[in-house]
Amino acid sequence: TMARAPNLFTIGGESHRAIESLPGLHPSAHGWASNQLSASDASPEVIAAVRHSFAQSLRDRDGVAPRPGQPVRLLEKTPKNTLRVPFLREVFPGAQFVFLYREPREVLASMIEAWGSGRFRTYPDLPGWSGLTWSLLLVPGWREYRDLPVEELVARQWATTLERLLDDLESVPASSIAPIRYADFLAQPQAEIERLCARLQLPWDVALGTLPPSRHTLTKPEPDKWRKHEDVLSRVLPKVEPTRLRVEAFLQRLG
């Protein structure tokens, strides 16, 4: 939705290739540890290569590339970048981070469906992994997930991601973080997108009607869709409760 803001540029999709195709940035270059990248991965050569990789594909909401020398505000929304905040701050000094938060029960239900669908496979030939093809983020400690039921796997995947993200955001100025709750956005999309853009000092001139499903959505979003997986979720939600509480405290501090 934010890609419809004037004077905002995107590369038209997620940035898997724009980053992981560059030498040293694919997980295989780090022993398949995870998708995590740190500030130390951002050498001057890497910074230049990443910026060039993005610049080649930049388009605004009308599909127009930036003019030579035109200042660019880039919108990037690849989930893997949740594990790359320190790296991104080196590549894009002054970066602002939109923290889109969704309740764990809803996220975990969607993740269970994503793993089962086969549409979100990220590393089909992940060394040392067996069972369902690895899907979504490659998180630190993933090797410990072998032989886990999928609900346990996604619970750990989510909690690990959020814990690392919160650790990294602690060093980011609060003025550079813009929180938004998924449920609030679905309930009041116009008000929430205007509030978010105001916080980011972005203009907004679009009247939102009914929101179309994301192109990555498997089934239509509904508040109680998670209940399809209620039985298995009841076993893992208590395990992610400490992370949920930490997120809530963080959001409260941001205001």
Locations of the language-model features?
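Short catalytic/ligand-binding loop motif for oxyanion handling, primarily in non-cytosolic enzymes
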Residues: 17-20, 82-84, 105-110, 116, ...
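PAPS-dependent sulfotransferases, especially Golgi type II membrane carbohydrate sulfotransferases
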Residues: 119-125, 129-255
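Conserved phosphate-donor/acceptor-positioning beta-strand/loop module used by diverse small-molecule
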Residues: 77-78, 88-114
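Acidic-histidine catalytic/liganding microenvironments
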Residues: 5-6, 92, 172
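Short aromatic-enriched loop/helix-cap "lid" or pocket-rim segments at secondary-structure transitions
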Residues: 21-25, 88, 109-114, 119-123, ...
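Glycine-rich phosphate-binding loop used to anchor ATP phosphates in small-molecule kinases
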Residues: 54-84
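PAPS-dependent sulfotransferase catalytic core
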Residues: 1-59, 215-218
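Short beta-strand segments
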Residues: 12, 74-77, 99-101, 179-182, ...
